[in-house]
Amino acid sequence: MAKKSLIAREKKRKKLEEKFYLIRRYPTKEMSKGGSLSESWEIQGKLEALPRNSAPTRLHRRCFLTGRPRANVRDFGLSGHILREMVHICLLPGATRSSW
């Protein structure tokens, strides 16, 4: 299980990302349109003024049971080994083990 502080940090990042979503979205659209170099520097300065943790690239998907940041299956929101255990004891309806 992941440390509680890491899970709390990830939740804080998620809240910041949601709070600054629209504020961050507008300047990035303006940057993609193109324009003069001075305008793009000005827009870049506005983006740099925002908190680092408000960037969506700093978020990680985590297993909602264990908090594990790696080997997540997006469809279930679980890490791979927890998903496998739950399928073995039939806690996930419709999921079957593969056999060939």
Swiss-Prot record:
UniProt-listed Pfam families: Ribosomal_S14
Keyword presence, Cell membrane: no
GO terms, molecular function: rRNA binding; structural constituent of ribosome
Compartment(s) where it occurs, according to its Swiss-Prot or TrEMBL record: Plastid, Chloroplast
Keyword Nucleotide-binding set for record: no
GO aspect biological process, one term: translation
HAMAP family, alphabetized: Ribosomal_uS14_1
Assembly and oligomerization: Part of the 30S ribosomal subunit.
Protein name: Small ribosomal subunit protein uS14c
Organism in which the protein naturally occurs: Pisum sativum (Garden pea)
Gene (UniProt): rps14
